[in-house]
């Protein structure tokens, strides 16, 4: 099978699912292993790519590991109400983040608050990648786009956040 590089796949998927005159100049890819932000030019080509640090905290896989530790499924997370005030968790290191979650749960903190804290931290990780890019029109893709709490916290920070139906398979679509 022929393969293409991920940035090229992102360009092709964008052109496939969005109309030519779409306003989106930023694609935030929130995946299981990495978070990336693609800055698009006016023709939909990738102008720049910003990647996060290699720490696992804030990635989809880390989020899933924490859910397993709490014995909560993704379906249960999807049905949860998002607390107004999420637990503050460290975004600097997965060990510190895991420790914050463990201590909070041991002190009786609600699981929903811990999950909201993790989701808010994930949204902050993406925001850090925007650097000097406008956050006016952002397309959110990747498996983590299905995390409604993360999307909720991103919407508080981004003026126009769009999550396409194909977000979970966006790169593969390209």
Give the positions of each predicted feature.
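Short acidic, glycine/serine/threonine-rich loops at helix termini
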Residues: 1, 16, 36-42, 49-51, ...
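Adenine-nucleotide phosphate-binding core of ATP-dependent small-molecule kinases
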Residues: 97-131
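Conserved phosphate-binding/catalytic loops in two-lobed NTP-binding clefts
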Residues: 2-8, 154-173
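Acidic-glycine-rich active-site phosphate/pyrophosphate-binding loop
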Residues: 31-42, 92-99, 144-158
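Glycine-rich phosphate-binding loop plus the immediately following alpha-helix
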Residues: 45-86, 168-171
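Glycine-rich phosphate-binding loops at beta-strand->alpha-helix junctions
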Residues: 130-157, 168-171
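Conserved phosphate-binding catalytic cores of ATP/NTP-utilizing and phosphoryl-transfer enzymes
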Residues: 1-31, 36-41, 127, 173-174
């Amino acid at each position: 099978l022929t393969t293409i590089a991920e940035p090229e796949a992102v360009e092709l998927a964008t052109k496939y699912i969005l109309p030519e005159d779409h306003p989106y100049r930023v694609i935030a890819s929130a995946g299981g292993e990495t978070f990336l932000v693609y800055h698009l030019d006016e023709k939909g080509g990738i102008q720049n790519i910003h990647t996060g640090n290699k720490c696992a905290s804030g990635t989809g896989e880390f989020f899933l590991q924490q859910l397993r530790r709490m014995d909560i499924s993704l379906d249960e997370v999807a049905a949860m109400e998002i607390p107004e005030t999420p637990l503050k968790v460290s975004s600097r290191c997965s060990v510190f983040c895991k420790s914050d979650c463990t201590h909070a749960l041991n002190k009786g903190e609600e699981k929903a608050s811990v999950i909201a804290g993790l989701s808010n931290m994930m949204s902050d990780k993406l925001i850090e990648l925007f650097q000097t890019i406008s956050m006016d029109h952002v397309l959110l893709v990747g498996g983590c786009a299905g995390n409604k709490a993360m999307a909720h916290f991103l919407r508080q920070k981004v003026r126009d956040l769009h999550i396409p139906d194909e977000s979970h398979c966006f790169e593969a679509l390209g």
